Amino acid sequence: VYKLAIGRYSASNLINSDMIWSDPYLVIRRVNILLSGIDVVPFNTTYTDALGNIRRLNDSMKAEARFLRAYFYFELVKRYGGVPIIGDKVYELNENIELPRSTFEQCIKYIVSELDDIKDDLRSLPLPDAAASAHVVNTQAAQALKIRVLLYAASPLFNEKPIEPGNELIGYASYDRERWKIAADAARNFINTYGTGDGAIMGLDDNFKNVFTNWYSNEHKEVIFFRENAMDKTVETANGPLGLSGAKQGNGRTNPTQNLVDAFLMKDGHFIKEGKYKYDEQLPYAQRDPRLEYTIIHNGSSWVNSTMETWQGGANNPLGSSYSLTSYYMRKFMGDFEAANEYQDTQHNWVMFRYAEILLNFAEAENEYLSTPSQAVYDAIIALRRRAGIEHGDKNLYGLTTDELTHNLTQAEMRKVIQNE
């Protein structure tokens, strides 16, 4: 992004995190190898599937593998459109692998059908031993991936505003508004099944800050699926502020932009310069959405028992070859070290799916399908803002109105809110 901004980006600059093609197909091949041989020797170990049936572990492992295959197909499709679908075949070295691309629609149908087929074969949250198996693929993860796939499939990029209209390899041949409804219904079903009532097994963590350092439990019901990392302080030492030494030394590798900081609301739920709180350029972080403090380390932030000085040349942004290009550092994903004297080993979970995404996906799909936002759309966004600590306002609308009196946002205004959330 920095090289783009200053005009120094070129074709020789690889964006490693998004240059994917061979790795997903490597995973797909490994899944197919597993599927072709796993039943040769049945497991004696058993598990309980999503329907409560006792089954051999083979069945769960096959379903988990197919989930990963569907996940990586989607990672390909959202970048390239239609890609070759291999199915279950394990190709050998001398076989013809010059397979034609499937259409975008064929790929979406394949991914969704795979997820529908495996959801009952997987285990369901809560798992009996969270510490040992919370990271295992579960039925909620399969359904969450399906919702994400359906939302992408309904989006303008693949429908009414494709890159190349009429090219079925990179989108649908024609727009169908009902695709929004299909995505909304899938998310609604998830919410009603797992996130509603006294026996709900999914929900929002009480504290946004804790989402990325806790796995699923009865107390923390937000995380659906994550990649587990070892207990360490790698994230803190890699991304913590510069200008500190010893056990609280950081390398400041992630520098959030001003655009991201400005995206955080005022604490009344309105965008900066729009609500009752007047945005002060001399005190730009005052009266803001509490999530700002949980996401960004800025000038004046408390961190490792110090007050940060992040202006260029300040104690935590020294001039030289290594400094923060934006005067900001990442806070999100790190442990609670505001008042600590040094970094300690901390659990860091790379969350792939969480309940907050389900609420947002539902709100987006429902809002796009209807001509005006429904109460259910308001409820989804209000739940997120209430958890964040946004003020409820006189009518308990958490800023989701232009006059603090009525539910009067248009579809376009609600779209802006959802996209910002």
Map each language-model feature to its residues:
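Carbohydrate-binding/catalytic loop surfaces
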Residues: 207-232, 328-331, 335-337, 399-417
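Conserved catalytic neighborhood of penicillin-recognizing serine enzymes
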Residues: 99-114, 384-421
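An aromatic- and glycine-enriched ligand-binding surface/loop that stacks and positions planar moieties
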Residues: 1-2, 62, 81-83, 108, ...
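Short, well-structured active-site flanking segments
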Residues: 77-89, 158, 371-384
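Active/binding-pocket-proximal capping segment
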Residues: 356-362, 372-401
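Glycine- and aromatic-rich loop/turn segments at beta-sheet edges
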Residues: 43-47, 82-89, 121-130, 198-207, ...
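Conserved, well-structured interaction surfaces
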Residues: 2-80, 94-134, 281, 286, ...
